[in-house]
């Protein structure tokens, strides 16, 4: 008895939506297989030697243990992970494994949990990975489309399906940025003027999605006065790239805590922007909005 799922990468923050906004991407993605075993243990196999297989240190193992204990499942699981989402890339690598595992266990043992509860369980993996039980990556990984995490106790997630074409380019630098470290450099306090700016622009981005206004969405996304100016310094050539493509994209910003860069190119410039990004970072991919974890 086993279930195999495809768990997509995600892009959190999207400029002004720090720790709130998340967007599901169609690819890259992890492939996760969860198999029920009679021995009451959790076995993890992963094709990336840099990822621990100890279930107490692996995000998938932590999520699995929490769900098995909470529902007194009485069996163990073997979790096989084929990583497609690079760790430390700012594309929700730990979230993909966490969300995929939660989804697969729910399917395998017919727990009938709703998506919000799956987000809650998946966020236990994020707690182990980044030191915070944040859900801005696992929420879009589960729901698909665009999500907003608006509360934690209790957990509340608002979901906006994206029903229009939105071209996306992801440039993935060959460096890693640790999420914990990327949080430590952030300002401890925010000025009132910057707060008003970010709240206003975040509201505008939601309005833009409902009105399918790519231009407004991208323009407001690039208006962050708090997080991007600090984290952008960690990414080689980030501000140079942003300046070079500014007239050819609806928007461009840091994906999550970086170093990946997410761009929404204008239709007539998609090839040109892709080539510019690839000139700086060979690992540049073209993708689109994803639908969330699914059984394969």
From Swiss-Prot:
It catalyses: L-homoserine + ATP = O-phospho-L-homoserine + ADP + H(+). One of its GO terms (cellular component) is cytoplasm. Keywords: Amino-acid biosynthesis, ATP-binding, Cytoplasm, Kinase, Nucleotide-binding, Threonine biosynthesis, Transferase. Pathway: Amino-acid biosynthesis; L-threonine biosynthesis; L-threonine from L-aspartate: step 4/5. Gene3D superfamilies: 3.30.230.10, GHMP kinase, C-terminal domain. It is found in: Cytoplasm. GO terms for biological process: threonine biosynthetic process. Pfam families: GHMP_kinases_C (PF08544), GHMP_kinases_N (PF00288). Catalyzes the ATP-dependent phosphorylation of L-homoserine to L-homoserine phosphate. Belongs to the GHMP kinase family. Homoserine kinase subfamily. PANTHER family: HOMOSERINE KINASE, HOMOSERINE/4-DIPHOSPHOCYTIDYL-2-C-METHYL-D-ERYTHRITOL KINASE. This is Homoserine kinase. It comes from Methanocaldococcus jannaschii (strain ATCC 43067 / DSM 2661 / JAL-1 / JCM 10045 / NBRC 100440). The gene is thrB.
């Amino acid at each position: 008895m086993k279930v195999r799922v495809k768990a997509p990468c995600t892009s959190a923050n999207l400029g002004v939506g720090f720790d709130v906004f998340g967007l599901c991407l169609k690819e890259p993605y992890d492939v996760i297989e969860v198999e029920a075993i009679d021995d009451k243990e959790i076995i993890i196999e992963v094709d990336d030697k840099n990822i621990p297989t100890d279930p107490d240190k692996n995000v998938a193992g932590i999520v699995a243990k929490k769900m098995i204990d909470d529902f007194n499942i009485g069996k163990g699981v073997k979790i096989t992970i084929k990583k497609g989402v690079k760790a430390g890339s700012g594309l929700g690598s730990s979230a993909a494994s966490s969300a995929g595992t939660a989804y697969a266990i729910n399917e395998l043992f017919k727990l009938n949990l709703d998506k919000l509860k799956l987000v809650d369980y998946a966020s236990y993996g994020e707690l182990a990975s980044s030191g915070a039980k944040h859900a801005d990556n696992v929420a879009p990984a589960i729901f698909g489309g665009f999500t907003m995490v608006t509360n934690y106790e209790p957990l509340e997630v608002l979901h906006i399906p994206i029903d229009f074409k939105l071209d996306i380019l992801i440039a993935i630098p060959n460096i890693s940025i640790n999420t914990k470290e990327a949080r430590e450099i952030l300002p401890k306090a925010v000025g009132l003027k910057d707060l008003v700016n970010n709240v206003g622009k975040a509201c505008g981005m939601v309005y833009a999605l409902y009105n399918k206004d790519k231009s407004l969405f991208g323009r407001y996304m690039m208006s962050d006065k708090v997080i991007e100016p600090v984290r952008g310094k960690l990414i080689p050539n980030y501000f140079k790239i942003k300046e070079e493509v500014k007239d050819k994209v609806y928007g461009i910003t840091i994906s999550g805590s970086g170093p990946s860069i997410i761009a929404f190119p204008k239709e007539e410039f998609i090839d040109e922007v892709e080539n510019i990004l690839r000139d700086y970072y060979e690992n540049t991919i073209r993708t689109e909005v994803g639908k969330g974890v699914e059984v394969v």
